[in-house]
Amino acid sequence: MTNIRKTHPLMKIVNNAFIDLPTPSNISSWWNFGSLLGICLILQILTGLFLAMHYTSDTTTAFSSVTHICRDVNYGWIIRYMHANGASMFFICLFMHVGRGLYYGSYTFLETWNIGVILLLTTMATAFMGYVLPWGQMSFWGATVITNLLSAIPYIGTNLVEWIWGGFSVDKATLTRFFAFHFILPFIIMALAMVHLLFLHETGSNNPTGIPSDTDKIPFHPYYTIKDILGAMLLILTLMLLVLFTPDLLGDPDNYTPANPLNTPPHIKPEWYFLFAYAILRSIPNKLGGVLALVLSILILALVPFLHTSKQRSMMFRPISQCLFWILVADLLTLTWIGGQPVEHPYIIIGQLASIMYFLIILVLMPVASTIENNLLKW
């Protein structure tokens, strides 16, 4: 009798994706982040569901409903902080996952990569709207500042902003619709993740060398299931250390003050995982220019496959590109730091230089370095 795992219509799909999947034998721990992102997503949906049972999306009661969750609901505090810090873990895994793709040339799987870029944008939108829901000072002013950026769009900008707000300012209508979108988007992310996986399994995984590994494949289970379980345990350990010891480490103290439209906080800034993009936005003195740079800072990822000039796929044997890659990582860390600083000297000029470097490395230096490395191969 054939194994039910291989014949049952539903179990067959699971089997081909997680059990009998032929996987390169040499993929490193950098390949763990895909499964970790799946775990993060499930964790966020579950904690979010329980939070939604007690949350009210009304401007008068939103803040106190979050307080009620933390004080009166059984284990409400841990659910709330797991959700808030789970978002941070989600973005850490996302950045690692994208970084891995850039380093090892995984972007040559065009469909998988493009859906990944869409996933990144959708996740950023979801996280932004989630940050608005507690209706603290930073929630309100963050929503006001970021949605206001759309007014930079010529001709339709103002109408667009008022349409998104559902009025002439961020108010009850805005909060209600943000809650609705924040609830539905994770399920869209889940569907997109399935398509992401579907396209990946059409080609099979990349590996650190960037060389086709069809001659050396091993089954996903038990080799990589056990490796993923180790990664998952480390992820959950890190998350619980954050939640139980320093739950507010990555948050903003201003968000413990209820939203007040009459009082602007001295420094409006988003969560840490948006600071690099926020720094790029602020580094351009022109409003429309800043918005374009902000959008391009993420969409530039979709251009990366077309800027690949190297004869090799991975950066494993390309020292100049490796050097540039780590400079890019340092540059992004610099931008993240600058995004959290006030707009004054010397932070302004550092932010501008780091923003120029970001686009310069990806658009100019990387392709040039690849061409130089191609020529060095002839020696």
From Swiss-Prot:
Alphabetical list of SUPFAM superfamilies matching this protein = a domain/subunit of cytochrome bc1 complex (Ubiquinol-cytochrome c reductase), Transmembrane di-heme cytochromes
What are the required cofactors? heme b
Q: How does it sit in the membrane?
A: Multi-pass membrane protein
Q: How does it assemble?
A: The cytochrome bc1 complex contains 11 subunits: 3 respiratory subunits (MT-CYB, CYC1 and UQCRFS1), 2 core proteins (UQCRC1 and UQCRC2) and 6 low-molecular weight proteins (UQCRH/QCR6, UQCRB/QCR7, UQCRQ/QCR8, UQCR10/QCR9, UQCR11/QCR10 and a cleavage product of UQCRFS1). This cytochrome bc1 complex then forms a dimer.
Organism source for this protein?
Capricornis sumatraensis (Sumatran serow)
- Residue numbers binding a ubiquinone: H201
- Does the record bear Kinase in its keywords? no
Q: Which GO terms describe its biological process?
A: mitochondrial electron transport, ubiquinol to cytochrome c
Transmembrane regions listed in the UniProt entry: 33-53, 77-98, 113-133, 178-198, 226-246, 288-308, 320-340, 347-367
UniProt protein name: Cytochrome b
Which CDD domains does the record match to this protein?
Answer: cytochrome_b_C, Cytochrome_b_N
Q: Which gene encodes it?
A: MT-CYB
